[in-house]
């Protein structure tokens, strides 16, 4: 077992950092700060950060095949032009639910942008329940709705053979799997593959490694856990020096580094003193596993 090293590479003080995505072309980590309405890009070589502020909470960001990025902003799927800091609306959802916003999102292996919604929180993880839905933005900009009655739509990824879709609705305290049809994007046969332990708290963002194992960030649990989706067993726990770990992705030149986002909102003054790096970006090396490059949106 290689020795694991955890370092805070950027003290960004995110209110709620989320959606880390490695951009290979720019050697950068993209991420968002949801309540600050910001998309950020941290260059791993220069250590510089560029920030784009949008007009609504921005909850996820993804690469785009045609260049630039796509993001979920409020209840809209948007194309993001980094150079002029502009966002163009591609589609909108939940028009009848004024209190909703998007949460986590990710692009599937066929280039569809999956993202789910939730009600705005009155405090971290406190909200009107069952208000969210899971959607996907297809390459032709049409949107499909998969299901509703979601509390906090969160982590998502696909198995290495593209036959299983993994999904987290945070307040179910479960990691779920669906059968997945790559050609159509259809999902079916939902089942739970892992129930969170009490000390792991709330399942949040998620990614997959090249061995087909899942990594889940545990909000309020201060850790990422590695799961075997076939056996339902937890294989590994990596604890971080912050409680509110929100999401994770692999990056770096060979995708052997893990990047973890976290939040400072919800910490009291004592918590902030004890966790000065809360809201920062963490890099974990020495895990001994690698991840996959993120898929770009095809539209």
From Swiss-Prot:
Its EC number is 3.1.1.17. The modification N6-succinyllysine is found at residues 244, 253. This is Regucalcin. Its main location: cytoplasm. PANTHER family: REGUCALCIN. Pathway: Cofactor biosynthesis; L-ascorbate biosynthesis via UDP-alpha-D-glucuronate pathway; L-ascorbate from UDP-alpha-D-glucuronate: step 3/4. Gluconolactonase with low activity towards other sugar lactones, including gulonolactone and galactonolactone. Catalyzes a key step in ascorbic acid (vitamin C) biosynthesis. Can also hydrolyze diisopropyl phosphorofluoridate and phenylacetate (in vitro). Calcium-binding protein. Modulates Ca(2+) signaling, and Ca(2+)-dependent cellular processes and enzyme activities. Its cofactor is Zn(2+); Mn(2+); Ca(2+); Mg(2+). A divalent metal cation binds at residues 18, 154, 204. It catalyses: D-glucono-1,5-lactone + H2O = D-gluconate + H(+). GO terms for cellular component: cytoplasm. It comes from Sus scrofa. One of its GO terms (molecular function) is enzyme regulator activity.
């Amino acid at each position: 077992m290689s020795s694991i090293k955890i370092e805070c590479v950027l003290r960004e003080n995110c209110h709620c950092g989320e959606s880390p995505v490695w951009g290979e072309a720019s050697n950068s980590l993209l991420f968002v700060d949801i309540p600050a309405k910001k998309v950020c890009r941290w260059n791993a070589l220069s250590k510089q950060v560029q920030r784009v502020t949008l007009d609504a909470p921005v909850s996820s960001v993804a690469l785009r095949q045609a260049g630039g990025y796509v993001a979920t902003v409020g209840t809209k799927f948007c194309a993001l032009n980094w150079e002029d800091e502009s966002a163009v609306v591609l589609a909108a959802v939940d028009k009848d639910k004024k209190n909703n916003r998007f949460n986590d999102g990710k692009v599937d292996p066929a280039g569809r942008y999956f993202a789910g919604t939730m009600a705005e929180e009155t405090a971290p993880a406190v909200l009107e329940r069952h208000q969210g839905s899971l959607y996907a933005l297809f390459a032709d900009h049409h949107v499909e709705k998969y299901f509703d009655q979601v509390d906090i739509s969160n982590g998502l990824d696909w198995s290495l053979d593209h036959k299983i879709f993994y999904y987290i609705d945070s307040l179910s305290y479960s990691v779920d799997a669906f059968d997945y049809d790559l050609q159509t994007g259809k999902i079916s046969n939902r089942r739970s593959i892992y129930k969170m332990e009490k000390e792991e708290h709330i399942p949040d963002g998620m990614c997959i490694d090249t061995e087909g194992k899942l990594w889940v960030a545990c909000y309020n649990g201060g850790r990422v856990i590695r799961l075997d989706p076939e056996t339902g067993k937890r294989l590994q726990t990596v604890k971080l020096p912050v409680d509110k770990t929100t999401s994770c992705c692999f990056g770096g030149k060979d995708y052997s580094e893990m990047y973890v986002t976290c939040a400072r909102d919800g910490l009291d003054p004592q918590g902030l003193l004890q966790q000065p790096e809360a809201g920062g970006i963490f890099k974990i090396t020495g895990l001994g596993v690698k991840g996959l490059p993120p898929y770009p949106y095809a539209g």
